[in-house]
UniProtKB/Swiss-Prot annotation:
Domain of life, source organism: Bacteria
Record pathway: tRNA modification; tRNA-queuosine biosynthesis
InterPro entries in the record: QueA (IPR003699), QueA_dom1 (IPR042118), QueA_dom2 (IPR042119), QueA_sf (IPR036100)
Reaction(s) catalysed by this chain's protein: 7-aminomethyl-7-carbaguanosine(34) in tRNA + S-adenosyl-L-methionine = epoxyqueuosine(34) in tRNA + adenine + L-methionine + 2 H(+)
NCBIfam families referenced in this protein's UniProt entry, alphabetically: PRK00147.1 (NF001140), queA (TIGR00113)
Pfam families associated with the record: Queuosine_synth
Family under the similarity heading: Belongs to the QueA family.
Protein task: Transfers and isomerizes the ribose moiety from AdoMet to the 7-aminomethyl group of 7-deazaguanine (preQ1-tRNA) to give epoxyqueuosine (oQ-tRNA).
Top EC class for this record: transferase
Source organism: Nitrosomonas eutropha (strain DSM 101675 / C91 / Nm57)
Assigned EC number: 2.4.99.17
GO molecular function (one): S-adenosylmethionine:tRNA ribosyltransferase-isomerase activity
This protein's name: S-adenosylmethionine:tRNA ribosyltransferase-isomerase
Localization (cell): Cytoplasm
Length: 346
């Protein structure tokens, strides 16, 4: 299958640059893949599509302030985007500079942090932070909110809260699980009042989520790896839901990938505990856990667009995205949502 099959034209003005004043005011495009049903709705309508006994699974990862600016020892400017935290003083990162820093060289970030460049693998550097404070504390003190590259502005103080879900708990992501950004406390309370069960997973979203697929044949793409955790309680909630005839709604592609990666390891059964995954979901994938998906609109030629095409069907997603463009939906991280009733057909 070709990467070109997942390309589409998107006017720049449809890329949301700012969040809405209220989280839950987004629009929502409802897609029933099995019935070829496409419906314009509001995110606040979500409870009407669920029933008592259904489960909604959230990713409770917390975004760290992963962007740092500074200088090379030669004086050239650098911008560092943490891709993954490896330990107390070590991380993998993307580095933007006029000339790539040499292995063994040092960087001075935010006029406070000395960093040694230890290794490089393609575009990813391994960095060691030479400081008495743990890396997590340094990022919280000196870092900046890692807004995606398609948001063409500098992060503001409001982004610290708005580019974070209201239920964020487990620190480690360098990008937000954006489908979760639509939920406010009122919506969470409403869902629970209606008897909708809430379950949690953790998947620490890496910067690789924004990378386009650069190969012509999607089967040649090398997927980035992310860490995830599935609690035993979540598995029990999902088992009871399935046994009672309920459906499982994954909030975001990250929640879906964590669940489906776990089920793949367990030969159809969810496996509790922590692991990492480079699962690349493309059309033809057999979904074992998730029945419904709430997700934002994704970038052309991206692995996430391929994932939703696998979940809903390629032609269904093409039609839905064209409808969204024609009707001026807002795209990407701060944009609107889609609620998809799954279809394993490719």
């Amino acid at each position: 299958m070709k990467t070109d099959d997942f390309d589409f034209s998107l006017p720049n003005e449809l890329i949301a640059q700012l969040p809405l004043a209220n989280r839950a005011d987004s629009r929502m495009l409802y897609i029933n893949s099995r019935q070829s049903d496409l419906r314009d709705a509001a995110f606040k309508d979500l409870p009407a599509y669920l029933k008592q006994g259904d489960v909604i699974v959230f990713n409770n990862t917390r975004v760290v302030k992963a962007r740092l600016a500074g200088f090379k020892s030669t004086g050239g400017k650098v911008e560092v985007m943490i891709e993954r935290i490896l330990g107390t003083h070590q991380a993998r990162a993307l580095i933007r500079a006029s000339h790539a820093p040499a292995i063994g060289s040092t960087l001075l970030l935010e006029n406070a942090i000395t960093v040694q460049v230890e290794a490089r693998e393609q575009d990813i550097y391994t960095l060691r932070f030479i400081h008495s404070q743990p890396l997590i504390e340094l990022l919280d003190q000196y870092g900046h909110t890692p807004l995606p590259p398609y948001i063409g502005r500098i992060a503001t103080a409001s982004d610290e809260s708005r580019y974070q879900t209201v239920f964020a708990q487990e620190t480690g992501a360098v990008a937000a699980p954006t489908a979760g950004l639509h939920f406010d406390e009122t919506m969470l309370t409403t869902l629970q009042t209606l008897g909708i069960k809430i379950a949690w997973v953790t998947l620490h979203v890496g910067a690789g989520t924004f990378q386009p697929v650069r190969v012509e044949n999607i089967n040649q793409h090398i997927m980035h790896t992310e860490q995830y955790h599935i609690p035993t309680e979540t598995i029990e909630i999902i088992r009871r839901c399935k046994a009672g005839g309920g459906s499982v709604l994954a909030v975001g592609t990250t929640s879906l990938r964590a669940l489906e990666a776990s089920a793949l390891i367990g030969d159809g059964e969810l496996v509790a505990g922590s692991n990492e995954t480079n699962l690349f979901i493309t059309p033809g994938f057999q979904f074992r856990v998730v029945d419904r998906l709430l997700t934002n609109f994704h970038l052309p030629r991206s692995t996430l667009l391929m994932l939703v095409s696998a979940f809903a069907g390629i032609e269904t997603i093409r039609h839905a995205y064209q409808h969204a463009v024609n009707n001026h939906y807002r795209f990407f991280s701060y944009g609107d949502a889609m609620l998809i009733e799954g279809d394993s057909r490719s």
